[in-house]
Amino acid sequence: SGEELEQMWFTLLTRTEEKLNAFSSKTPIDQARRMISNQCGQAAEQAGGVFRLSVPTGGGKTLSGLRFALAHARKYRKQRIIFTSPLLSILDQNAKEIRKYIQDDSLILEHHSNLVRTEQNSEQLDERELLTETWEAPVIITTLVQLLNILFSGKTTCIRRFHSLCNSVIVIDEVQTVPSKMLSMFSLAVNFLAEICGVTVVLCSATQPCTEQIEHPIHGPIRDIVPYDPALWQVFQRTDIQSVGSMSLEQIADFAVKKLEHVDSLLIVCNKKNQSEHLYSLLKDKSFALFSLSACLLYTSDAADERSSVDL
């Protein structure tokens, strides 16, 4: 019923806000994250439609988006919240964060190809398969491909999930990764969801795509949850970018070792995997951990957890 839905969202929202309010506000970054989160909570009071959440990298976009979705779902009695991302690596990271705050796995359905199954018996497996077929869980974490399949594919399995999109909150993360040739079709889908299905759509990104100058633009206005503030973005400018393309891999390895004597972290972007592999072979004696996205998800998750426990 509507009352039960509202109570469920209220409980989840209260739990989430309590955890968010427990965060420290000592540093400028902490203060900026809290301001972004509070703005998301306030914006959730607005009526449904299409929203834009543009937050600097490191601004707590996942948790702020979760707060908006829960608050909006509570006020307008939405059936479910659907979190989508075009990239599996981002989806896995977001899923872990969302689970920490929802704190009830029975309310969450993850639907993507990288999922590690944890069902202990056939009954649990049957229940999960049914939820995957119907998308009737309160919180769904999935890929943008799965969402678009429901809208555009004629497969029975996709059509069976269609009703679950109605009267929901759909948060689309890293929306800038949608290929430019697909933006027009994507905008048509967003318009249909918002205008026909009663869906509140949230487009999340630090670098929003241009959806106004295409053949089928998103019908406006798209409301900004967090107004653009140059001072806010300046707080999150924590990187120093250097081009080392003229160096050999051996020179880059030496550069990295020397740089890490003065900084806490360093990211090296290579064009090819074999370059990354060779670079790691030059650095592996320096006690650097190896995380390969070519490995299965379970291995990389365990490796990351092990590394975190060592750091602690």
Protein language model features and the residues they cover:
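Conserved strand-helix element at the start of the C-terminal RecA-like helicase core
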Residues: 88-90, 262-282
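Inter-Walker segment of RecA-like/P-loop motor cores
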Residues: 106-149
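Conserved small/polar residues in nucleotide/adenosyl-binding loops
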Residues: 299-306
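Interdomain hinge/linker at the junction between the two RecA-like core domains of SF2 helicases
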Residues: 209-255
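N-terminal accessory nucleic-acid engagement/regulatory domains that precede
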Residues: 1-22
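SF2 helicase catalytic motif II
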Residues: 161-185
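Conserved Walker A/P-loop ATP-binding site and its immediately adjacent core
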Residues: 80-100
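Walker A/P-loop
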Residues: 48-68
